[in-house]
Curated annotation (Swiss-Prot):
Catalytic activity reported: ATP + H2O + 4 H(+)(in) = ADP + phosphate + 5 H(+)(out)
Gene: atpB
EC annotation from Swiss-Prot or TrEMBL: 7.1.2.2
PROSITE patterns linked: ATPASE_ALPHA_BETA
Protein name according to UniProt: ATP synthase subunit beta, chloroplastic
Keyword GTP-binding part of the UniProt annotation: no
Principal location: plastid
Enzyme's top EC category: translocase
Amino acid sequence: MRINPTTSGPGVSALEKKNLGHIAQIIGPVLDVVFPPGKMPNIYNALVVKGRDTVSQQINVTCEVQQLLGNNRVRAVAMSATDGLMRGMEVIDTGAPLSVPVGGATLGRIFNVLGEPVDDLGPVDTGTTSPIHRSAPAFIQLDTKLSIFETGIKVVDLLAPYRRGGKIGLFGGAGVGKTVLIMELINNIAKAHGGVSVFGGVGERTREGNDLYMEMKESGVINEENIAESKVALVYGQMNEPPGARMRVGLTALTMAEYFRDVNEQDVLLFIDNIFRFVQAGSEVSALLGRMPSAVGYQPTLSTEMGTLQERITSTKEGSITSIQAVYVPADDLTDPAPATTFAHLDATTVLSRGLAAKGIYPAVDPLDSTSTMLQPQIVGEEHYETAQRVKQTLQRYKELQDIIAILGLDELSEEDRLTVARARKIERFLSQPFFVAEVFTGSPGKYVGLAETIRGFKLILSGELDSLPEQAFYLVGNIDEATAKATNLEMENNLKK
């Protein structure tokens, strides 16, 4: 699908053709604006309020038209704080939706929802902008090739492999490691695949956004000396922003990614942290606009809003967008409408478990709950499929036996079940892995494990060749050779203690 980029500045289109209205009502981030008869702006048009407040501070607020109320009134949602706005202030209809800068000049820079740089590195050197509201690519333009996207993370590559050009969801409650996993994926993909990434920070912590930026500079993903050599563009609309900005920042990031796909014909990675906050912002805006709430207080348009965003994240014959989205699960309830609606759009789901995080097994990916449409023998091959199924069977049997172990103890199990439990505990620990982005916390260097190495390691555990090794030897290591070396070191340490 080709974009027709314009060549005006970012944020708002040229303001020459002035269609002027004035503010009639302000309720928090929502403005009612009156326009002259016959000059009503279209839905999604950007409106700009410029002027000075009561203490002569400059005001420049951009809003987006959401409703036409009748009587020449429109209702718009502000993209920044509405402090200092007053009734009667002049409002300019720009005659077009919000437009943001696109292209190579966006790499290495941080933007807000309007496409304005917020990193104090001066203006963006691009004349090309693109509107954030566009239709999804036509069905005939979509690409249908199936191939695996290797991440270097054992548990993901083996049990819930990602599809190149697919959509992946990271599900988890608060504090189980979604953001760390996303940061590791950005790091691994930038190093191993050398692709261009766009990161959309939607309604998450500003501190984490800052940490991510600093880490990217340290690791070279963002090149400070030569900013054009950078591999990622960052778009932030964090927790402190009004709901309008949080609702639209995902579209800003997606618009930048679409340009790399359609015009530059590149394979792009789009990270969204957190897609739940996109839904949450939509819910806030929906309530402010006076719509009747739906199930659990969510907006009645939940499925439509999610579909509009997700249908644009796709692969065409020009290039691909592989999207990795963190999904916060409220109160760890996967049946909540927000995560449940997201599930429908995904090719793979990586579910993070509080139980595993409590055991200290990181990444805390639940091997039985995580799924992928790619885990089929005709796609991944017989060896990979068989190994993954046997790993899942072993872990499932261990899960079934846990109640018996808790009540009666290990000694009451049959010989076969005891062996299954021992291997399952080794597998559980071998699914952990030291991360590059967590080196500061763990003290151990990060590891990238190729898919072939991962399969070899799990086949060895399942075959029983490593039954004699202690289970702690498999904890936080890379490939299986490191586990055997760690077992030898542990044995030597024990002998020295004796």
